[in-house]
């Protein structure tokens, strides 16, 4: 695990080196999902490209009730994020029947036109030709192994014919790329030097860990977080990182990424991949997996309403919301929210019957420039110069920019990283949300200009709160 141990002594400045990819990331003026803002002046936050890339990696790990092995080939599971005009239309992963790209075509069809797609693996030629034909504007992918694995030991039974097919498919995919209109590339943007440390700190201080420690003062948040972090780090590096440099160069060459094999591009690429994996490990560690019998359990009697989701799926969705919070425009109180619904019929997606309704994070109104609105909290004595009346909450943005309508017949669920405030509770109740998964650490509290008194009084919505499993 030499690669894993290398972060302990890594220089954060390495993650800031620009990665050549046709666009100079340092000279691109980033347009936020909400606020138009240059990198200068903003607090530490993930870029859109890095956020969507991390979401695609995380979707590859979506828990499945049964093993997902494609029936018709040796393709590995891929995660996919579908984005249109900075709005997330879908979070997908491969199923037993379909690759992630095929899932997108079936689920979105003509709505894929002008969309940006972020894959956790370079898609195969079968998916690429369909997506190009659908008129997508950009296809970005993680620079690890391809969907049809180019690493022989990753293939089932180590079949040489399967490896040969993977090489032929990589050649066909490269030809499709060179002759297509969409921009197909690796899109990893430089990290601000403070992002890694900031996200480590905010993950360690997340409400989910805070709830566990509040109930058990003898526990140490730092110890819990570090144990989870190093476990996640090892697992994610094994999953998403090719530790052997020569084998990594072989894969990059087969995928048409020869420029990345030359120094300093190669070292910069690998350092940036490690940094993003570290962020994913950090965020995932903020929601421990059933630590000390903790999980998301319903307050009401079990007989009321729909049954809750499996704990693994709940945790996965909450971590999606935590990743969204990394893009917040209020880094002091970053909040993320994601809405999923459970349909009645089996779907082609690797998420089973679940489909994305919407997602968001707290941010200022669309189109506003940085510092147009107050940034200060209660420390600003003049109340009219505080941020609270201007910033949109994560729950509000998830409902406003939803990609699907909320259906009365489906079980619609919201996953949010903090207890909903009194401004959001009525919206959640009236929108048709049937279940909410969150923490009640702030419930029944008043914090200066924001209160949390109405959450416990929210009727008609099942509340699944971080708590100890009943014996």
Curated annotation (Swiss-Prot):
PROSITE patterns: CYT_DCMP_DEAMINASES_1, CYT_DCMP_DEAMINASES_2. Zn(2+) 2 binds at residues 393, 421, 424. This is Cytidine and dCMP deaminase domain-containing protein 1. It holds the Pfam family dCMP_cyt_deam_1. Keywords: Hydrolase, Metal-binding, Repeat, Zinc. One of its GO terms (cellular component) is cytoplasm. The active site is at 395 (proton donor). Catalyzes the deamination of cytidine and deoxycytidine into uridine and deoxyuridine, respectively. One of its GO terms (biological process) is cytidine deamination. Transmembrane segments: none annotated. PANTHER family: DEOXYCYTIDYLATE DEAMINASE (PTHR11086:SF18), DEOXYCYTIDYLATE DEAMINASE-RELATED (PTHR11086). GO terms for molecular function: cytidine deaminase activity; dCMP deaminase activity; zinc ion binding. Its cofactor is Zn(2+). Residues 57-153, 312-460 form the CMP/dCMP-type deaminase domain. Zn(2+) 1 binds at residues 99, 124, 127. The gene is cdadc1. It comes from the Eukaryota. Its EC number is 3.5.4.5.
């Amino acid at each position: 695990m030499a690669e894993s141990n290398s972060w302990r002594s890594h220089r954060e400045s390495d993650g800031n080196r620009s990665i050549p990819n046709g666009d100079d990331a340092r000279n691109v003026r980033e347009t936020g999902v909400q606020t138009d803002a240059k990198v200068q002046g903003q607090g530490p936050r993930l870029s859109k490209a890095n956020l969507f890339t991390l979401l695609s990696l995380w979707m590859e790990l979506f828990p499945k009730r049964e093993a997902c092995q494609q029936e018709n080939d040796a393709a590995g599971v891929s995660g996919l994020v579908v984005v249109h005009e900075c709005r997330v239309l879908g979070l997908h992963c491969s199923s037993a029947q379909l690759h992630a790209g095929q899932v997108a075509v079936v689920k979105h069809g003509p709505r894929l036109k002008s969309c940006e797609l972020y894959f956790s693996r370079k898609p195969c030629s079968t998916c690429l030709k369909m997506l190009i034909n659908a008129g997508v504007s950009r296809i970005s992918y993680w620079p690890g192994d391809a969907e049809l694995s180019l690493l022989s030991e990753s293939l089932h039974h180590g079949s040489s014919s399967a490896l040969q097919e993977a090489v032929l498919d990589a050649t066909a995919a490269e030809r499709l790329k060179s002759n297509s209109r969409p921009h197909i590339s690796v899109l990893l943007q430089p990290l601000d030097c403070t992002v890694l440390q900031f996200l480590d700190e905010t993950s360690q201080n997340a409400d989910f860990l805070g709830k566990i420690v509040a109930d058990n003062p003898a526990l140490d948040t730092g110890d819990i977080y570090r144990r989870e972090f190093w476990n996640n780090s090892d697992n994610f590096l094994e999953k998403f990182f090719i530790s052997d440099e020569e084998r990594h160069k072989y894969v990059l060459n087969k995928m048409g990424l020869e420029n990345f094999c030359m120094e300093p591009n190669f070292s910069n690429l690998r350092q940036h991949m490690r940094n993003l994996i570290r962020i994913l490990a950090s965020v995932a560690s903020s929601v421990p997996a059933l630590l000390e019998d903790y999980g998301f359990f319903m307050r009401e009697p079990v007989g009321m309403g729909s049954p809750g989701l499996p704990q693994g799926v709940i945790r996965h969705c909450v971590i999606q919301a935590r990743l969204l919070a990394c893009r917040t425009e209020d880094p002091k109180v970053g909040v993320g929210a994601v809405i999923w619904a459970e349909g009645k019929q089996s779907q082609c997606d690797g998420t089973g019957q679940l489909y994305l309704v919407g997602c968001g994070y707290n941010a200022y109104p669309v189109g506003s420039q940085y510092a147009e609105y107050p940034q200060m909290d209660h420390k600003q004595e003049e109340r009219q110069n505080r941020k609270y009346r201007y910033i949109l909450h994560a729950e509000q943005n998830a409902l406003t920019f939803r990609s699907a309508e909320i259906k009365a017949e489906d079980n619609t669920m919201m996953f949010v990283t903090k207890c909903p405030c009194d401004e959001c509770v009525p919206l959640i109740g009236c929108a048709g949300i049937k279940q909410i998964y969150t923490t009640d650490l702030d419930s029944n509290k008043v914090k200066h200009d924001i209160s949390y008194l109405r959450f416990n009084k929210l009727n008609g919505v099942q509340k699944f709160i971080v708590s100890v499993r009943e014996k």
